[in-house]
A protein has these predicted regions:
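Nucleotide-sugar donor-binding and catalytic loop/hinge architecture
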Residues: 93-110
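Conserved donor-binding/catalytic core segment of Leloir-type glycosyltransferases
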Residues: 105-123, 129-133
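Nucleotide-activated donor-binding/catalytic signature segment of Leloir-type glycosyltransferases, i.e.
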Residues: 139-166
Length: 166
């Protein structure tokens, strides 16, 4: 689990709402319908699922513990497998420090596009190029592109802005 949707009626993150702990109803995220309570209906249907053969796997101890609070999941089996990202190596840093470290300009808007193979049509580079064409006149000297992944000169040449590769 990467969010709390399995434990709630419809929310991925319930915010301050704790109705899922007892019974989801009249969800503050939904427009009210006086004739039908979608949250209550979905929560009731989720409660009918047999939990004996399901193990919920959370990506953190926190998400697992929050999901266990859910009314209909209290008897379910839970475990967590933390994300395999080294948070000491990958952490937030000041924007200017990061830009300097990667040789990126400090005075430009940067559009990042990342994929293992940037030219893979499923990744949508053509849509980014089209969007850049629309931005070109208004932001000619204020935008640069940052590409992360395997790219080609053919792809890079299609961008109307300066391209930085990492």
């Amino acid at each position: 689990m990467h969010d709390l949707w399995p434990a709630t009626a419809i929310c991925h993150y319930p915010g301050g709402c704790e109705k899922y702990i007892s019974n989801c109803y009249q969800c503050p995220m939904l427009k009210r319908n006086p004739f039908f309570d979608l949250a209550a209906s979905v929560f009731k249907e989720k409660g009918k699922i047999g939990l004996s053969k399901i193990t919920f796997v959370g990506c953190s101890r926190w998400i697992m513990e929050e999901a266990q609070k859910g009314n209909w999941l209290r008897t379910a089996c839970f475990t967590s497998i933390p994300n395999p990202i080294d948070v000491t190596a990958f952490k937030r840093m000041e924007k200017q420090v990061a830009r300097k470290r990667f040789g990126l300009p400090e005075d430009k808007f940067l559009l990042l596009f990342a994929a293992a193979k940037l030219s893979d049509t499923r990744k949508g580079a053509i849509f980014l190029i089209e969007a850049c064409e629309k931005l070109k006149e208004k932001y000619q000297d204020r935008i640069e592109i940052v590409l992360m992944g395997n790219s080609s000169e053919e792809l890079i040449s299609q961008f109307p802005f300066k391209v930085n590769t990492l």
